[in-house]
Amino acid sequence: MTCCGCSGGCGSSCGGCGSSCCKPVCCCVPVCSCSSCGGCKGGCGSCGGCKGGCGSCGGCKGGCGSCGGCKGGCCQSSCCKPCCCQSSCCKPCCSSGCGSSCCQSSCCKPCCCQSSCCKPCCSSGCGSSCCQSSCCKPCCCQSSCCKPCCCQSSCCKPCCSSGCGSSCCQSSCCKPCCCQSSCCKPCCCQSSCCKPCCCQSSCCKPCCCQSSCCAPVCCQCKI
């Protein structure tokens, strides 16, 4: 049994540890090599012996043993939980390389701004209409990421994409996200006559511009 690399017994008063080791605090543990820490700082007992390159943190802070040594020099403020900024270490703040819109407050879960890391805000590269507040679910503005605020592919629910007629692209007019073919459901060119929702070619079913005159073609009456 050694005392932080110092030869000698491990008595109740640290029994022979030199000034370069942990003299005030007895640091006698089965395996303890404080050379990697540049000396025991704050008492090796608090972290069960210095482990794996604590120098990057400037000594063990809060117990490096929980993460097997500090990594990447991220032992600061309330950034880390155990003692690093990788994998699932961080909670409130993100590592570098994330967009300014994401790496803040309680934005991230693990520690990044990609894949399924972020919750409320989106990563860069999304349209201005999507990457805001509670717009996205995982962290993008494509596929099925966004809920209320985007107009692409199958992202949107309530709003329509551009290029639709003013009578269609509103409120809960569309289902997938367009005003063509069989995209729209409830809205019509006039009252509530159309089923799919547009007044072109084979758009309408039973609706009519007057009574029940239209079948395949909309807004033209059969005589």
Curated annotation (Swiss-Prot):
Keywords on record: Keratin, Repeat
One GO term describing the cellular component: cytosol
InterPro entries named in the record: KAP (IPR002494)
Tissue: Expressed during the active phases of the hair cycle in the medulla and the inner root sheath of the forming hair. Also expressed in the upper layers of the epidermis of skin.
Region: 14 X 4 AA repeats of C-C-X-P, residue numbers: 21-216
Residue ranges of Sequence repeats: 21-24, 27-30, 79-82, 89-92, 107-110, 117-120, 135-138, 145-148, 155-158, 173-176, 183-186, 193-196, 203-206, 213-216
Functional description taken from the UniProt entry: In the hair cortex, hair keratin intermediate filaments are embedded in an interfilamentous matrix, consisting of hair keratin-associated protein (KRTAP), which are essential for the formation of a rigid and resistant hair shaft through their extensive disulfide bond cross-linking with abundant cysteine residues of hair keratins. The matrix proteins include the high-sulfur and high-glycine-tyrosine keratins.
Protein family per UniProt: Belongs to the KRTAP type 5 family.
Oligomeric form and interacting partners: Interacts with hair keratins.
Protein name per UniProt: Keratin-associated protein 5-4
Species: Mus musculus
Source taxonomy: Eukaryota, Metazoa, Chordata, Craniata, Vertebrata
